[in-house]
C-alpha cells in the first residue's frame, strides 16, 4: 500500500484566495514505461464529495485505451521514465470526465491506467463547512513482492520520520509537486497494529 500524502482543501466561498487548483486530466501510469495492468489506485474521502465542492473525476473505460493514447501522445515514449502524464488539451478524451460522488468512508478504486483528475467545484455550499471542504487520502495497492529490501527500509523510515511518497508503493520516491511540511519537528510516529506494520513492510514475525 502506498504512503501518499493527503489532499486537503479549505473552504473558499468567502475567501477566494483559498480556492485550490484543479489538476489537469492525466494518467499516473505512463504506458510507455508500465504497459498493462500494474496496480489499483484509490481515494478515501473523509468529507462528502459533491458537485459544488468537487473531487475525483474519471474518464470511464479509458484504462483500455493505452495504445491509442500512446499513438496520440508521442512524449510518453520520448520520456519513458516519467509516470505522471498530462492528457493533451486537444485530445478527444477531454470533456469525457465525470465526477464520482462519495460519502465519508467510501472507497473509490480504479485501474492505475485510468485517465482522471481532481476538479474543484464552485464551492457554493461549502460555507457550512467549519473546518475543511475536502480531505481525501490517496491509496494505491500492489503486490508486496515488487518492493525491494531497500524500498521496504525506506518505507519504514518514512513512517518513523513522517515522509510521504508517490502513488507507487514499491518505488518509495517523491511525487510531483511534493513539498516539505513546515511542522515536521512536531511529527510523532504512530503506534501501528500488526496489520498496519505489515502494510508498511515490517516482518512482524521477526519482531
Listing of model-derived features with the role each one plays in the protein:
Residues 1-58:
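Conserved double-stranded beta-helix
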Residues 9-11, 59-66, 134-136, 140-146:
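Short edge-strand/loop segments of extracellular domains
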Residues 14-20, 54-56, 68-71, 121-123, ...:
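Short aromatic-enriched loop/helix-cap "lid" or pocket-rim segments at secondary-structure transitions
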Residues 36, 101, 131:
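Extracellular/periplasmic catalytic domains that process cell-envelope and extracellular macromolecules
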Residues 39, 49-117:
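Double-stranded beta-helix
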Residues 108-109, 113-207:
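Non-heme Fe(II)/2-oxoglutarate
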Amino acid at each position: 500500500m502506498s504512503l501518499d500524502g493527503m489532499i486537503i482543501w479549505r473552504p473558499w466561498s468567502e475567501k477566494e484566495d483559498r480556492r485550490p487548483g484543479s489538476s489537469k486530466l492525466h494518467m499516473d501510469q505512463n504506458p510507455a514505461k508500465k504497459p498493462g495492468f500494474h496496480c489499483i489506485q484509490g481515494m478515501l474521502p473523509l468529507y462528502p464529495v459533491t458537485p459544488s465542492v468537487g473531487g475525483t473525476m474519471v474518464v470511464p473505460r479509458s484504462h483500455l485505451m493505452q495504445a491509442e493514447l500512446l499513438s496520440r501522445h508521442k512524449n510518453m515514449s520520448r520520456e519513458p521514465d516519467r509516470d505522471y502524464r498530462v492528457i493533451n488539451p486537444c485530445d478527444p478524451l477531454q470533456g469525457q470526465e465525470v465526477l464520482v460522488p462519495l460519502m465519508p468512508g467510501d472507497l473509490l478504486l480504479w485501474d492505475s491506467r485510468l485517465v482522471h483528475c481532481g476538479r474543484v467545484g464552485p464551492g457554493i455550499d461549502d460555507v457550512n463547512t467549519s473546518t475543511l471542504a475536502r480531505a481525501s487520502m490517496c491509496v494505491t495497492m500492489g503486490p508486496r513482492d515488487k518492493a525491494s529490501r531497500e524500498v521496504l527500509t525506506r518505507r519504514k523510515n518514512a513512517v518513523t520520520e513522517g515522509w510521504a511518497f508517490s502513488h507507487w508503493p514499491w518505488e518509495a520516491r517523491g511525487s510531483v509537486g511534493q513539498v516539505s511540511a513546515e511542522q515536521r519537528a512536531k511529527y510523532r510516529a504512530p503506534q501501528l497494529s500488526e496489520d498496519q506494520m505489515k502494510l508498511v513492510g515490517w516482518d512482524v514475525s521477526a519482531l
